[in-house]
Regions:
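Anion (oxyanion) recognition and catalysis
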Residues: 36, 114, 159-160, 271
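ATP-dependent carboxylate activation and anion-phosphoryl transfer catalytic cores
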Residues: 9, 14-15, 21-24, 238, ...
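Short, Lys/Arg-enriched N-terminal segments with co-localized hydrophobic residues
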Residues: 1-8
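Hydrophobic beta-strand scaffold residues
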Residues: 42, 120, 165-166, 277
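Phosphate-binding site of ATP-dependent enzymes
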Residues: 28, 152-153, 160-164, 171-262, ...
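Redox-cofactor binding/interface segments in oxidoreductases and associated redox assembly factors
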Residues: 13, 92-93, 206
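Short glycine-rich anion-binding loops that position phosphate/pyrophosphate groups of nucleotides
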Residues: 17, 95-98, 170-172, 295
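Conserved N-proximal alpha/beta basic substrate-recognition cap immediately N-terminal to
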Residues: 19-148
Length: 323
């Protein structure tokens, strides 16, 4: 019997190495801090620590940690042991993309843990079924003109039709590998060659959205409901990419009526599939990506607006566990 959510809980965060956290902006850190503030035990591991062996439950070599409240060291380790994932009240999967074969295998290990009784967020099957770039195909009414193909001819025809286009690989993150080609088609051949690798790699091509000048908006869904503020990531200098990792500037702002319309249409559907935390990327009025692996921007929104996103997330997690 799981405790009602006014009782203290054990949360396992599967994350990137703790030593690499940039705590001034890290979303997983803000989740851990909020959980600890409520008296919950924070435990961490990396995907490399997780194993399944016949006759045993899926388990991990975990680190019990205490957040110090300081910049460095930001945590102290209070113990290390092997524990079954099903013995935690919640397992929060926070490993960054890329969604490569290792990530795919991780979702299967976590799926096995789920069958054994572990409560994993986001749901491993849902992580697998929602590749960040391709998940938008399910909601064509909200997206810009888009093409997904391996064919150079298709890409050239799409360019001839739309003029200004953006080309992106399906497995990039943080704006990696994203190219803009103008109506003149300058460099289109070289870019197709780079991304498409002679027809071996699938490419996504979209009509260029001039709204990017006002920012690539990250709209967060928690338990299917939109956070009232988004983070507009505004390209700097000569960039067409707003991603913070590509030097974009993050400006928090209230979500627009269109942002809310998209969020309220997708929210309940995605939440019902076990996606407790989702980051929608919206440029102008168009949905461009659905991020499910490790959505970020909690700290930026909270610092600029006072809306405590980590609190909203842990509230939703506690409520879900009590349900």
């Amino acid at each position: 019997q799981r405790p009602p959510y006014n009782e203290l809980m054990n949360f396992l965060f599967i994350a990137d190495p703790l030593e690499s956290f940039k705590i001034y902006k890290d979303t997983t850190f803000s989740m851990m801090r909020e959980a600890q503030k409520r008296g919950h035990q924070v435990v961490a591991c990396e995907m490399t620590d997780v194993r399944w062996q016949q006759g045993e439950a899926v388990s991990a070599r975990v680190r019990k940690i205490h957040l110090t409240g300081e910049q460095t060291p930001w945590f102290t380790e209070t113990g290390k042991h092997r524990a079954a994932l099903k013995d935690f009240d919640a397992v929060v999967m926070r490993t960054d993309p890329p969604f490569d074969s290792e990530y795919f295998y991780a979702t299967h290990l976590l799926g096995q843990a789920e069958r054994e009784g572990a409560k994993v967020f986001n749901s491993p099957a849902a992580l697998r079924n929602h590749p960040e770039k391709l998940a938008i195909m399910e909601f064509p009414q909200f997206i810009a003109p888009t093409l997904v193909t391996r064919s150079e001819d298709d890409i050239r025809a799409f360019h001839a039709m739309h003029g200004d286009i953006i080309l992106k690989p399906l497995d990039g993150m943080g704006g990696m590998g994203i190219f803009k080609v103008g109506a003149d088609g300058l460099n289109l051949g070289a870019i197709i060659e780079t991304l498409n690798q002679g027809g071996r790699q699938t490419v996504m091509v979209q009509k260029f959205l001039p709204g990017i000048a006002q920012g690539d908006k990250r709209v967060l869904l928690i338990g299917g409901k939109p956070v009232p503020f988004c983070l507009a990531r505004i390209p700097q200098g000569g960039e067409v990419r707003g991603n913070l990792a590509a030097g974009g500037k993050g400006v928090a702002q209230p979500i627009s009526a269109r942002d809310r319309e998209i969020a309220e249409a997708l929210g309940p559907i995605l939440a019902a599939r076990g996606l407790m935390l989702v980051g929608l990327d919206i440029i102008g009025d168009s949905l461009t990506e659905i991020n499910v692996t490790s959505p970020t921007c909690f700290q930026e929104i909270t610092k600029q607006t006072g809306f405590d996103v980590a609190k909203a997330f842990i509230d939703a997690l506690e409520a879900r566990l009590a349900a």
